[in-house]
C-alpha cells in the first residue's frame, strides 16, 4: 500500500464523517432519538398490551426509528473509532491495520448510501404500505400471461425487500395467466419504493401460445397507491385556534345578556368557525364549542381523504396504453425504462424481482 492509497483512506473517512453529520441534521437525529426513548419506555410498560392496536403501532414506530437512530449511532461510533485507528496505524506503518480500516470504511459507506437513498422519499405517503393493481391489456391470452409474470415479479421484489405480501384479489384469464390482481405490500416505505412503477409495461417476445413461434407484443398496466389508515385522530394545536367571547343573544333571561358567556372558536389553518351560546356559563359554552370543533375537523379530514382517494382513482383511469414506462424485449435480452433510459440485459433477474436499478433511477430523477 503506497502513500497515495494510505492518504485516500483518510480522505474517505473524512468524507464519510461529513456525510454522516449531514444525515444527522437532515433526518433530525436528536428528535428521533428522544422519541425512540419515549417509545421504548411505552413498550416496556406491561399495560401497553391492554391495547393491542396501540402496541402494534408503537412496535412499527420503533422499527422505523431504529432504522435511523441505531444506524446513525453505529456510523458515528464506527467512523470515530476507525479515524482514531487510522492515525495510529498510519504512524506505526501497520499495513494490515490500514487494510482492515479500508474494509470497514467500505461497509460503513454502504449504510450511509442507504440512508442517503431514504432522503429521496419526499411524498408524505412514502412510508406507508402499498397496494399494487395489475391489469392485463390488449393481447388476449398473451396479455394475461404477461400480467401473471408481473404479479410474480412484484411478489419476488417484495420478498427481496423483506416485505409482507397478500394477494387481495385475482381474476384468472380465460386460458392462462390473469386478467387482473391486487397485491397488498406491507413494509417500511413500500409505497415510496413502488410508486414509480405505475404505468404501462410492454412485453415483446416469441409467444409460447403461438405454434408458429411468432413475435407478439402485449401490455399490462400497473397502478400503485398507498394504504390509508382508516383511524383518524384529531389533534388540535391550541395555538391554531383563536377564541373570542361575546354576549349571547336570544333566550336565557337577563343573565345571558350581561356577561360574555358565548364562545366562538376559529381554527386558523382551515378557516372552520364554531360557536356556542346555549349554555349559561362561558365554561360550558367553551366545552361544547371544542367538541363541535373536533367534529367539524373530523368531517373536514374525512372529506379531504375522500378527495385524495378520488384523485388516485382519476389518475388510475389516465393510465392508458400510451403511457408506457418500461419495455421488456425478451428476444433481445433487453429491458429498458423509457423515462430514465436505464437499460439492462439480465432479463430473468428483473423478472425475478431485481428492480432496484430501475426504482432507484426513477426516484433520483424525480419521476
Swiss-Prot record:
UniProt-recorded name of the protein: Peptide chain release factor 2
Positions bearing N5-methylglutamine: 254
GO cellular component: cytoplasm
Family matches, as Gene3D superfamilies: 3.30.160.20, 3.30.70.1660, Release factor (1.20.58.410)
Any GO MF annotation of the entry: translation release factor activity, codon specific
Primary role: Peptide chain release factor 2 directs the termination of translation in response to the peptide chain termination codons UGA and UAA.
Lineage: Bacteria, Pseudomonadati, Pseudomonadota, Betaproteobacteria, Burkholderiales
Localization terms from the record: Cytoplasm
Domain of life of the source: Bacteria
Keyword annotations of the record: Cytoplasm, Methylation, Protein biosynthesis
Entries under PROSITE patterns matching the protein: RF_PROK_I
PTM section of the record: Methylated by PrmC. Methylation increases the termination efficiency of RF2.
Cross-referenced InterPro entries: PCRF, Pep_chain_release_fac_I, Pep_chain_release_fac_I_sf, PrfB
Protein family according to the UniProt entry: Belongs to the prokaryotic/mitochondrial release factor family.
Amino acid at each position: 500500500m503506497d502513500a497515495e492509497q494510505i492518504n485516500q483512506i483518510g480522505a474517505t473517512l473524512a468524507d464519510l464523517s461529513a456525510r454522516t453529520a449531514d444525515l444527522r441534521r437532515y433526518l433530525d437525529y436528536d428528535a428521533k432519538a428522544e422519541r425512540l426513548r419515549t417509545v421504548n419506555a411505552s413498550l416496556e410498560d406491561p399495560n401497553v398490551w391492554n391495547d393491542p392496536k396501540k402496541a402494534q403501532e408503537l412496535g412499527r414506530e420503533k422499527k422505523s426509528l431504529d432504522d435511523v437512530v441505531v444506524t446513525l449511532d453505529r456510523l458515528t461510533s464506527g467512523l470515530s473509532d476507525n479515524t482514531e485507528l487510522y492515525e495510529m496505524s498510519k504512524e506505526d506503518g501497520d499495513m494490515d491495520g490500514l487494510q482492515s480500516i479500508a474494509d470497514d470504511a467500505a461497509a460503513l459507506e454502504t449504510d450511509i448510501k442507504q440512508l442517503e437513498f431514504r432522503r429521496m422519499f419526499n411524498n408524505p405517503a412514502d412510508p406507508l404500505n402499498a397496494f399494487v393493481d395489475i391489469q392485463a391489456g390488449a393481447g388476449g391470452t398473451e396479455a394475461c400471461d404477461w400480467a401473471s409474470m408481473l404479479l410474480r415479479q412484484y411478489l419476488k421484489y417484495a420478498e427481496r425487500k423483506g416485505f409482507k405480501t397478500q394477494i387481495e384479489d385475482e381474476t384468472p384469464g380465460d386460458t392462462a395467466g390473469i386478467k387482473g390482481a391486487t397485491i397488498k405490500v406491507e413494509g417500511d416505505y413500500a409505497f415510496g419504493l413502488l410508486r414509480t412503477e405505475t404505468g404501462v409495461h410492454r412485453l415483446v417476445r416469441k409467444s409460447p401460445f403461438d405454434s408458429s413461434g411468432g413475435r407478439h407484443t402485449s401490455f399490462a398496466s400497473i397502478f400503485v397507491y398507498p394504504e390509508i389508515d382508516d383511524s383518524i385522530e384529531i389533534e388540535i394545536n391550541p395555538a391554531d385556534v383563536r377564541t373570542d367571547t361575546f354576549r349571547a343573544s336570544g333566550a336565557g333571561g337577563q343573565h345571558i345578556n350581561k356577561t360574555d358567556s358565548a364562545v366562538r372558536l376559529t381554527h386558523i389553518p382551515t378557516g372552520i368557525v364554531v360557536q356556542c351560546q346555549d349554555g349559561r356559563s362561558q365554561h360550558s359554552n367553551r366545552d361544547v364549542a371544542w367538541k363541535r370543533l373536533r367534529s367539524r375537523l373530523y368531517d373536514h379530514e374525512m372529506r379531504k381523504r375522500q378527495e385524495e382517494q378520488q384523485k388516485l382513482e382519476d389518475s388510475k383511469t389516465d393510465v392508458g396504453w400510451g403511457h408506457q414506462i418500461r419495455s421488456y424485449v425478451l428476444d433481445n435480452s433487453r429491458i429498458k425504462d423509457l423515462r430514465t433510459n436505464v437499460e439492462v440485459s439480465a432479463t430473468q433477474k428483473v423478472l425475478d424481482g431485481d428492480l432496484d436499478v430501475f426504482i432507484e433511477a426513477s426516484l433520483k430523477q424525480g419521476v
